[in-house]
Amino acid sequence: LLYLRCNLPFNKVLVNFIVFYLYLEMTNKKEISAAIIIIGNEVLSGRTKDLNTSTLATWLNSLGISVGEVRVIPDVEKTIIDTVHELRVKYNYVFTTGGIGPTHDDITAESISKAFNIEYGFHKEAFAILEKYYEPGNFNDGRQKMAKMPVTANLILNPTSGAPGF
């Protein structure tokens, strides 16, 4: 399961990481499928335009990975958990965007932790990355929240905003 920060353009580091990871998987499987989950009340209400679905689906299909489904869901814990559980049994990969920022309604990371029964807390490496990214005195509680995720997560570096995905 890979998570991308909401509505940020794909960067080369992220793309290279995912290409390498999926290449390793593709060498062992004949057909690979994926689903995309867009998480956010702001997308459902129309306040924020989803900029990732087309880019991600086009890119995955160009790699020979068939995108079988795209869903837009609200920032609701049960909905996130249920959707992840449903799609992960149908597809080889589930990509998500949204819901892992600094605001109170960004609950994706915690919901994913619960879905996989993994401890949720400050990820030491993510915390260090963010602490270094922000100037002294600007690494407030909201920004620190972006370092909370499944504690065993593998990070996807994000030079655009500093906040790593996982």
Locations of the language-model features?
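N-terminal small/polar loop signature for handling phosphorylated ligands or for N-terminal nucleophile
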Residues: E31, S54-A115, K132-E135, M146
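Eukaryotic N-terminal low-complexity, Ser/Thr- and Lys/Arg-rich leader segments
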Residues: M26-K30
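Short glycine/serine/threonine-biased micro-segments
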Residues: I38, L44, T96-G99, T103, ...
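Conserved hydrophobic helix-helix packing surfaces used for dimerization/oligomerization
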Residues: A34-I36
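Short hydrophobic targeting helices and cationic amphipathic motifs
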Residues: L4, L8, L14-F17, L22-L24
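Glycine- and acidic-residue-enriched helix-capping/strand-helix junction motifs
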Residues: I39, V43-T53
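Proline/glycine-rich low-complexity loops and linkers
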Residues: I107-F166
